[in-house]
Amino acid sequence: MSDFITVKGARAHNLKNIDVKIPRDKLVVVTGLSGSGKSSLAFDTIYAEGQRRYVESLSAYARQFLGQMDKPDVDYIEGLSPAISIDQKTTSHNPRSTVGTVTEIYDYLRLLFARVGKPHCPKCGKPITQQTVDQMVDNIMSLPERSKLLIMAQIIRGKKGEHKKVLEQIRKEGYVRVRIDGEVIDINEEINLEKNKKHTIEVVIDRLIVREGIEQRLADSLETALDIGEGIVYVQVVDGELLMFSQNFACIDCGISLPEIAPRMFSFNSPYGACPECSGLGSHQQFDIDLVMPNKNLSPAEGLFAPLSKNPASYAMVQIEAVLKKYGYTLNTPWNEIDKNIQEYLINGSGEERFNYSYVNMYDEYKEYFSPFEGVMPMLERRYKETNSDIMRESYEAYMSTTPCPKCKGARLKPEVLSITIGDKNIKQVTDMTIAEASEFFKNLKFTEREEIIAKQIMKELHARLGFLLDVGLEYLTLSRAAGTLSGGEAQRIRLATQIGSGLVGVLYILDEPSIGLHQRDNNRLLATLKHLRDLGNTLIVVEHDEDTMYAADCIIDIGPKAGAGGGEVVAQGTVEEIKQNLDSITGQYLSRRKYIPVPKERRKGNGNFIEVVGAKENNLKNINVKFPLGVFTVVTGVSGSGKSTLVNEILYKGLASKLYTIKGKPGKHKEIKGIENIDKIINIDQSPIGRTPRSNPATYTGVFDSIRELFSQTNEAKIRGYKPGRFSFNVKGGRCEACHGDGIIKIEMHFLPDVYVPCEVCKGARYNRETLEVKYKGKTISDVLNMTVDEGCVFFENIPKIYRYMKVLQDVGLGYIQLGQPATTLSGGEAQRVKLASELARRSTGKTLYILDEPTTGLHTADIHQLLDVLQRLVDGGDTVVVIEHNLDVIKTADYLIDLGPEGGNRGGTIVAKGTPEDIAKVKASYTGQFLKPLLEEGKRLNKRDA
């Protein structure tokens, strides 16, 4: 086998026909500036080809069901193994996916509980054992003497059909009576059942009267019934109750039998185990009165009912006015002045009481109705169920909240399933443990000799999988945590742990920044995991910017030298020491500290005002009070799972945004937020896409395209032709090419081959029709402008201040290499975040804006971080406030103020460990952040002195 993966002539995206030799069975880091071509090499070339070759080995029939990969633009690749990509984009948002199900730990738990779980009665809690025939006889003999009994075996339960064969079989076996749907019938009568109705059929085995001496006959009849009824017998007391006995599991005291205990019973995705009320979701989404009526001091006319406030002339408002008018109120009456009964009418409906409604409809027709008022909440529920529009559905969901299912209280499973325990814990209690707690629980579990034999293999798998999750720094996650709530880094590390669990050898793993979201403290464990995967006999290609990972790598490939068109070349390749010596490598310059991010000489003190969160206790936060100083650059730090995102995103952002705007979802639990009067805007700049379709691009998102279209409409040619700005939009009829509807490309479906995208034959990919493209500004068409990079745009629009301002800020945030018309779907998370940042920077500062960023360094090289920090510091210099959640020490050391949460993750986190300047935090021994910050601040002083 070859010792190298040899790539020849890679040209995907911006790669410049490069050749690379990657050593096999080694840990290889691919690094470089954001947009330099790292992912193009690792994912779009090497992974795509490895995956494509594997899929090509399957039949054409199988291929049509698999995600097809295009053949990458490369001459050839040798020495390639089957490739597995572990990226951050494939997080499941299915509400049924949990940490337990994704890691397959839940599958082993289901098996363990089914095989060695101890059943209890869901009603009285007593341990349940299987009933013997003797116990059944004793139970029946305790009934009042002379009670008449029917001993029956059920053979059909709730099935459609005429069941003629079944009835004929009963007749042949010599039985005289059957009970069909509760009615006892002589088997020799003509029985015609409705074909499309569900029927239940029991064979009457014997008829008895309770008295002394019948025990033997009763036992024989029970045994026959148990044999026919698969371990279950029904005893009908004539004119009395129906008793059920089971050879399987049943509570003798309560008369409750459990079905046969099988792994599927413990699955909340199976009808055998799922709570019937919520179908195993554990929650209900419903309209929340606090979101529908966020400010109860308002009147209906002032927007009391938020979902109805957008259209004050709607029929719903006419109805509300009619209800109020009847009782002497108006739309201008404040809510707290309206009688409680009338409030109830408005919220939940008037029942039978009717009202007169009169209004003019959209056709100017006068209409009158006399009917009850259904109520605002039922009206919203009805509209939500009836609408076919995704946009309307999404707008309604902004007023809904998720509440635990009233029946299972969020447990997702049936009561009889939750009554089965191991070590006095049911499966829900085990999955509510953190991974660290679950690992400890299983280590201390004691089994009988028989149980030990049964559980041995299952326990081995559980210990291994929990151990791998501990190794990648996820001990704070609970097994019941929804997969959709995980960050990209957490989801990636879970998949990494799952891969280690699979124990494959000779595989090519390609990872995308596995250190994201991981505190410096946990880095060594992650690196040990990566090395373990390598030592099994696998090749790891890791796209990464983290210095610790580079020092641990066997080989580093630095792609660059710049981003976009200025990148796509191999600048340097070798060990970390060789990269440090390479003067052309920007990575080497930062590793050797020839370049570095300086520690500020002094920290800002702020403007004296604060935003204070009081009594934060969502998730693991321990009722803490946190002050955020305004006018400074604040970084919230702490180990993974310490409560940073909960505090900043769920409480601070949602709490403030719900007061300033209408937002989706409720803020996390807290008492109050003080100091809201000191800000007028709060903006969360996250890494979600700037648009979900290729029609969204940086020019449309920032709003600069409006000014560009305006500029083109002012040219002489456009004025002569009467073209308005709308003519230069590729989204509407008029100026766009109608053959491709302004996309520039046409999709051709190839069924079991990948879909092919070809340039539109009419416009040749220009998006516009010929007439529109005849209008030029400085020799360029509107299509040429969309194909310009930001750097080119800066030069081209230098004399148009309105446009140049946007170009300059896009350049300042390090996006000079992207095209103005680059589809949003091709931008990375980090690029999308910086487009949003530029969009905000281009606006005039009010000095009262609070910006929130969650791990903005994701996907950024140290050089990009340097540039990003300059931009964030500019925002603060303008009087605004920036709050960042971050693990990157280069960002942490440049902050004015730090809030360090911890000390650990999960239940052992959620408190403030330290707060103050980075220098203050470095002195706190209990702070993990401080421990790593201290040497960095000392190094910063030395470097500042060196270059002074």
Feature roles, as predicted:
Residues 1-948:
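Conserved phosphate-binding elements of NTP-dependent enzyme cores
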